[in-house]
A protein has these predicted regions:
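Short beta-strand-centered segment that lines the nucleotide-binding/catalytic pocket of NTP-utilizing
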Residues: 27-40
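ATP-dependent NMP and nucleoside kinases share a basic, alpha-helical "lid"
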Residues: 95-105, 109-138
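Walker A/P-loop
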Residues: 15
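ATP-dependent small-molecule kinase phosphotransfer cores
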Residues: 37-108
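Hydrophobic anchor at the beta1->P-loop junction of P-loop NTPases
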Residues: 4-6
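ATP-binding Walker
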Residues: 12
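P-loop (Walker A) phosphate-binding loop of NTP-binding proteins
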Residues: 9
């Protein structure tokens, strides 16, 4: 499996480009933002750490993390946000790494879409990285 990273700034069209490539090439697509939610599900790698750190008040009646309650905390406290990012980003990278390991011998293309390609080290998992760039309007 050949791994292509797709990155770009907010509003650059990276999601559009990734979805078009998925459609045209029949590629598998991993979206880091969505994986951030996956790794917070009960039984997943980041769930226990997050609940232990922030407490039961962020747990919904169904046992999942109440993302609205968590957002209220992390968007009003930079230290809490930094802590959460230090848990989520490595968990997402590990999820991607596991997916690559499981599929490495298969043919085809795996696309990884993330705005934080280099900041998280995700680029090291890719065979190549494509940047989607749109210049600012003047």
């Amino acid at each position: 499996m050949y791994v292509i990273g797709i990155t770009g700034g907010v509003g650059s069209g990276k999601s559009y480009a990734a979805h078009r490539l998925q459609e045209k090439l029949g590629a598998t697509l991993l979206i880091a933002d969505e994986l951030g939610h996956v790794v917070m599900e009960p039984g997943r790698s980041a769930y226990c750490q997050i609940v232990e750190h922030f407490g039961q008040n962020i747990v919904s009646s169904d046992g999942s993390i109440d993302r609205v309650a968590l957002a209220e905390i992390v968007f009003s406290d930079a230290r809490a946000r930094d802590w959460l990012n230090q848990v989520i980003h490595p968990a997402v990278i590990e999820y991607i790494r596991d997916t690559i390991r499981q599929n490495r011998t298969r043919s085809g293309i795996l696309l990884i879409e993330t705005a934080l390609m280099y900041e998280t080290g995700c680029d090291s998992l890719c065979d190549e990285v494509w940047l989607v760039y749109v210049p600012e309007e003047e």
